[in-house]
């Protein structure tokens, strides 16, 4: 059995890169009752990375808030309600960045995260792997990013006191994306 080497880099290859949703994920984690970590994910999201010849890059990611997946339907309904995402009024979350930089071996995106009607600057850190060519000739890169936010800054304020003290949910939420992005085909001249 042989291992295949994967190039890990902070250099962004020039081009327009679009999401391969089959091989990508978007999720979150938050402390629950001070004793565990609750995790959820989103099923519908998109991302696009455009890298210019001069090395500047734009990133845009969007998430359908009502595509949230958790293991309990009552909890899911609560997360869709005005107590949390209020998906009838705010169907989409978004992150956009025009500031990509490198910090040692990490890729850093400084961008604007919008949840509900709240927009704040957020730093997302992670890795860029590839490029690699698929068996079908498509060139891909992998982008894994993590950002930590205070959910109350985005209007996600619901909480409940626990009988023995403390609160049901932590305010700090870790957002994660693991993306495979495919380079768009060059237009024929």
Locate the predicted segments by residue:
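Low-complexity, acidic/polar, glycine-enriched regions of mature
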Residues: 1-189
